[in-house]
């Protein structure tokens, strides 16, 4: 075979991409004789262009997939499209087209871009969420949940984005703004559909322990905090001159004697009763309305300026009998706990800040054991351990003892109940958008709310539709979609016009990939049992709460609905969160003018160079700053590999990686090259398998290539040298092929192989080959290094002593001294102790 003298990626990459596609090289199916491995990267939204963040994410996944195949696994590595969402509607308005047309055009473009990068996807499994063949199953899940009471409809204040014209889930509001467009959100009362994710709160929390060693600590912590489990007590405070009472939630019943205010959320239902006869009713309702319109997450923030107003009513402390003023506070949330708190300023920072601002009393009821604090000099609350004071019959108890004793007392008098509270709220999945999965619900005047019969699914989203210029959904005006017959009574009815949150689409796609062509069910349970769960999932940490939490919930939901096997409790066994690709110190964006176009880079340098640089620039979990010099360096290295192969090709023969194990080496050079070959195999294997440190793995391959460059001219002079060099070249190509598959396939074929390098077994290192023939012995006298010796490995004790004690430098240090003892650690060190 005639080899090109120059490395031209544009020629060889197209050649091998065509070969892989024609051969269906990465297609897979169930094989009971093989151990499976399912690797998946978070799929993209089809915006039309991949970016460098995609390239980094997918390059990491592709390396893992390729190595696992070479290790003998049956590898599932699919790709698809998270295709519903607002951008398609905005593009349709801008370009006067249909969202479906825009979306499918982008899918075609992005598929071609991903193929240009040589990723080893099984494209026969490709799916898109906007395809009715996909979303019909999502609608089926909804109907199942409706029948089992796991989805419900209610009217409540919702996060509303005025720009996107839709509701946002709490998780989609970032610091008071829309997660997508950064517009400040407002509160709007709407009737919405909710999935009962709270039914799974305990399991979602408990099962995080099974992920402790395979998911990043940061993600585990973020999910724990979002779930927000609090074990505490609900305590009833009677309202003065009333039969009513206010129930508060607290985790600190030991501080109840220090409560100096009851603070209500502005949405608390009892306010209507409390304010009914108040002269300041109008003023109070103005304040309440202002608080209600604040962003929910802003109200939770520690940075919030805490505002409140006294409503001129009082509660009675059930322990002390003291009157406590009732306030309304902007930092109290109606849907957390009971929507009411007792403020204990002496022992809580939030309460301290609020009460100091409004000159409310501060009553110390816990005295630290080694510090004296009093109401007049206190500058910050005491939140630690201590002994109760000013607490009636409980004075003198430690606060840990008092928690239980006070709770028991309040339970006895009927004023307390032990409860568990959660920060997590049910998932609002209704969206006032067009381009999404239709919610399969029908509204009938006679029958009420009715689900679409399963045999009538899917409810097809109309695709030839006029998009409203103001961004609102056109579905409410689309009579051909809305008007229908009630499936129960046959009367005139209306369809639901809200569509599902697009995070529903991506919460179960990993399961559809295992059986994507199934037209009878979402996936066959036996097939799911073979492939699931995903062995390695890869994506950004920014999805720690939204996507990853929802996917965990959906896995448990589909298990309980009978779609997934009973032993599948988690979607992703291992999680790798990669950092961002940044440029000039900031995230790439059009507005900053620092975008690097992958297509342009491929045109200049080739896909292998781009892949190599993205893997080499930094450890995967860290951000890396794009640099032109870095990409040039990766390009030069591949040229160097090509040039090395050209130089040695006439002198080497067809062989396999690590074959030097069976070659007997007799010279210092061949022994050294053989040892470095196996050191490299070990280093690359361990760095990738155990730590996913692709950068250090690539660095070790580069070092080995340099070794071969320096030694090739001498190695080609002997048969033994040629044999060692042949094995070494095969090893370089095999180890490098998961990162840069095109160039390695090309050189592998020039080496005389007729099969793809991806079918090669991953090389194994020989422990014996790692050993040096010569070792360095360090000599210490009274703890100080006095000399070093290069000696044959495993030299006998007598021979080693003869060399050391006859060395002039050592004898100089020993002159006039008595040797008390000497200790030899074979092949490493000798310690001599003298007096």
From Swiss-Prot:
The entry's ATP-binding residues are: 590
Q: Gene behind this chain? A: leuS
Write out the GO MF terms: aminoacyl-tRNA deacylase activity; ATP binding; leucine-tRNA ligase activity
Offer one example of a GO biological process linked to this entry.
leucyl-tRNA aminoacylation
Query: Which Enzyme Commission number(s) are listed?
Result: 6.1.1.4
**InterPro entries per the record?**
aa-tRNA-synth_I_CS, aa-tRNA-synth_Ia, Leu-tRNA-ligase, Leu_tRNA-synth_edit, M/V/L/I-tRNA-synth_anticd-bd, Methionyl/Leucyl_tRNA_Synth, Rossmann-like_a/b/a_fold, tRNAsynth_Ia_anticodon-bd
Which Pfam families does the UniProt entry name for this protein?
Anticodon_1, tRNA-synt_1, tRNA-synt_1_2, tRNA-synt_1g
Family matches, as HAMAP family: Leu_tRNA_synth_B
Catalysed reactions listed for this entry: tRNA(Leu) + L-leucine + ATP = L-leucyl-tRNA(Leu) + AMP + diphosphate
**Where found?**
Cytoplasm
- Which GO cellular component terms are attached? cytosol
* 'KMSKS' region, short sequence motif: residues: 587-591
Family in the record: Belongs to the class-I aminoacyl-tRNA synthetase family.
Which enzyme class? ligase
Annotated motif 'HIGH' region: location in the chain? Answer: 44-54
Protein name from the UniProt record: Leucine--tRNA ligase
Keywords per UniProt: Aminoacyl-tRNA synthetase, ATP-binding, Cytoplasm, Ligase, Nucleotide-binding, Protein biosynthesis
In terms of superkingdom, the source organism counts as Bacteria
């Amino acid at each position: 075979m005639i080899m090109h003298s120059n490395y031209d990626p544009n020629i060889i990459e197209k050649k091998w991409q065509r070969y892989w596609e024609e051969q269906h090289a990465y297609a897979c199916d169930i094989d009971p004789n093989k151990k499976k491995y399912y690797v998946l990267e978070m799929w993209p939204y089809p915006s039309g262009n991949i970016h460098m963040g995609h390239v980094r994410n997918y390059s990491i996944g592709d390396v893992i997939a390729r190595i696992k195949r070479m290790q003998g696994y049956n590898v599932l590595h699919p790709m698809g499209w998270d295709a519903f969402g607002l951008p398609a509607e905005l593009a349709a308005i801008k370009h006067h087209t249909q969202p479906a047309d825009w979306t499918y055009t982008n899918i075609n473009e992005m598929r071609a871009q991903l193929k240009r990068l040589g990723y080893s996807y099984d494209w026969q499994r490709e799916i898109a969420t906007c395809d009715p063949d996909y979303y019909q199953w999502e609608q089926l899940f909804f109907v199942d949940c409706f029948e089992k009471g796991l989805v419900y409809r209610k009217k409540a204040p919702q996060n509303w984005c005025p720009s996107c014209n839709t509701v946002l889930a709490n998780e989609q509001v970032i610091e008071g703004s829309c997660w997508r467009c950064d517009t400040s959100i407002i509160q709007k009362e709407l009737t919405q559909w909710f999935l009962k994710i709270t039914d799974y709160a305990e399991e979602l929390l408990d099962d995080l322990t099974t992920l402790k060693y395979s998911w990043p600590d940061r993600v585990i912590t973020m999910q724990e905090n979002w779930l927000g489990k609090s074990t505490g007590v609900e305590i009833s405070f009677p309202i003065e001159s009333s039969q009513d009472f206010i129930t508060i939630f607290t985790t600190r019943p030991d501080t109840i004697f220090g409560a100096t205010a009851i603070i209500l959320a502005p949405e608390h239902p009892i306010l209507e009763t409390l304010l009914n006869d108040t002269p300041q009713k109008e003023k109070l309702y103005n304040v309440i309305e202002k608080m209600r319109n604040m962003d929910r997450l802003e109200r939770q923030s520690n940075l919030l300026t805490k505002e409140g107003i006294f409503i001129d009513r009082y509660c009675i402390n059930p322990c002390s009998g003291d009157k406590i003023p009732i306030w309304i506070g902007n930092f109290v949330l109606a849907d957390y706990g009971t929507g009411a708190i007792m403020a204990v300023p002496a022992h809580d920072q939030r309460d301290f800040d609020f009460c100091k601002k409004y000159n409310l009393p501060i009553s110390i009821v816990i005295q630290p054991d080694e510090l004296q604090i009093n109401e007049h000099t206190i500058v910050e609350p005491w939140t630690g351990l201590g002994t109760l004071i000013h607490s009636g019959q409980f004075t003198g108890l430690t606060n840990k003892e008092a928690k239980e004793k006070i709770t028991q007392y309040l339970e006895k008098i009927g004023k307390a109940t032990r409860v568990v509270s959660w920060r997590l709220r049910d998932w609002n999945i209704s969206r006032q958008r067009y381009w999404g999965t239709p919610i399969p619900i029908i509204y009938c005047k006679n029958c009420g709310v009715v689900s679409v019969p399963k045999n009538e699914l899917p409810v097809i989203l109309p695709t030839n539709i006029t998009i409203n210029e103001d961004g609102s959904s056109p579905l409410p005006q689309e009579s051909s979609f809305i008007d229908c017959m009630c499936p129960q009574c046959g009367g005139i009815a209306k369809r639901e016009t809200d569509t599902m949150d697009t995070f529903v689409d991506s919460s179960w796609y990993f399961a559809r990939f295992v059986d994507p062509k199934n037209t009878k069910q979402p996936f066959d349970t036996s097939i799911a049992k073979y492939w699931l769960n995903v062995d390695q999932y890869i994506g950004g940490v920014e999805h720690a709460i939204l996507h990853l939490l929802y996917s965990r919930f959906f896995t448990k939901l589909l298990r309980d609905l009978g779609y997934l096997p009973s032993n599948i409790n988690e979607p992703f066994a291992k999680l790798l969160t990669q950092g961002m690709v940044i440029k000039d110190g900031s995230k790439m964006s059009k507005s900053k003018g620092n975008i690097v176009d992958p297509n342009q880079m491929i045109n200049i340098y080739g896909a292998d160079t781009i892949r190599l640089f993205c893997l080499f620039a930094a450890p995967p979990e860290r951000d890396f700053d794009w640099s032109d010099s870095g990409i040039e360096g990766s390009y030069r290295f591949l040229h160097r590999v090509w040039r090395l192969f050209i130089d040695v090709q006439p002198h080497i023969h067809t062989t396999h990686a690590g074959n030097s194990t069976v070659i007997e080496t007799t010279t210092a050079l061949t022994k050294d090259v053989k040892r470095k070959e196996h050191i490299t195999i070990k280093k690359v294997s361990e760095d990738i398998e155990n730590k996913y440190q692709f950068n250090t793995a690539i660095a070790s391959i580069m070092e080995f290539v340099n070794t071969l460059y320096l030694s090739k001219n001498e190695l080609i002079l002997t048969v033994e040298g040629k044999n060692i060099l042949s094995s070494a070249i095969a090893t370089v190509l095999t180890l490098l092929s998961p990162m840069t598959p095109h160039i390695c396939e090309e050189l592998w074929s020039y080496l005389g192989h007729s099969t793809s390098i991806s079918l090669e077994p991953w090389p194994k290192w020989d422990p014996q080959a790692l050993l040096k023939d010569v070792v360095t012995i360090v000599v210490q006298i009274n703890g100080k290094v006095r000399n070093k010796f290069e000696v044959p490995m495993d030299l006998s004790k007598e021979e080693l002593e003869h060399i050391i004690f006859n060395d002039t430098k050592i004898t100089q240090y020993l002159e006039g001294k008595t040797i008390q003892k000497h200790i030899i650690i074979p092949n490493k060190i000798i310690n001599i102790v003298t007096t």
